[in-house]
A protein has these predicted regions:
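Small beta-barrel nucleic-acid-binding modules, principally OB-folds
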Residues: 25-29, 35-38, 153
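Cyclic nucleotide-binding regulatory domains
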Residues: 34-93
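Nucleotide phosphate-binding site architecture
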Residues: 18, 36, 76, 98, ...
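Residues that scaffold the ATP/ADP-binding catalytic core of kinase and kinase-like folds
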Residues: 20, 56, 78-79, 107-108, ...
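Cyclic nucleotide-binding regulatory module and flanking cytosolic helices
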Residues: 1-31, 74-76, 80-82, 111
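Residues that recognize and position ribonucleotide moieties
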Residues: 10, 27, 46, 68, ...
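Polybasic "coupling" helices that flank or enter modular domains
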Residues: 93, 110-153
Length: 153
């Protein structure tokens, strides 16, 4: 399977893809697996290639809320650029992903402006979707909310 199944990698200029490719490792992610915890700086970033990863916010009372899902159009672990994670990344649906050490990606960023732009666009989509989720939760029925989640994944 080619790493280009991940849309973020698929859209890169060939020159940037060739810079990143040698550092990608295909891994199998298991449902329920935590990729990193709240407050940790992720050691790796993941480019999902079938797996779906939930962004989880754990509450002090032990309750967890899924705030976002990341799939083949995303990068998991982008929060490492900002420091410790503000969420827990939990595998919601088993599948494959390509991983890369974050330290490696950080070194390669100056050589890959297209990748940086793609990550920023992905973050913009995430913010837009989170805003829509808030509106949906206040305005739509549970059935309509369920349909939105199915369309996302």
């Amino acid at each position: 399977m080619s790493p280009r199944i991940n849309e973020l990698l698929a859209d890169l200029p060939e020159s940037e893809y060739q810079i990143l490719y040698p550092h990608l490792e295909l891994v199998s992610l298991s449902k329920g697996q935590d990729l990193f915890q709240l407050g940790e700086v992720p050691s790796h970033v993941y480019y999902p290639a079938g797996a779906v990863v939930s962004v989880m916010k754990d509450m002090e009372d032990g309750f967890s809320v899924e705030t976002y899902m990341l799939g083949k159009s995303s990068l998991v672990g982008h929060c490492a650029f900002m420091g410790p994670s503000y969420y827990r990344a939990n595998v919601r649906s088993s599948g494959l992903a390509y991983k890369m050490p974050f330290a490696t990606l950080r070194q390669l960023v100056p050589l890959c402006p297209g990748h940086t732009q793609a990550v920023m666009q992905s973050l913009g989509r995430m913010i837009a979707q989170l805003s829509q989720t808030i509106v949906c939760g206040k305005h739509h029925s549970v059935e309509k909310q369920s349909m939105r989640w199915m369309l996302i994944t």
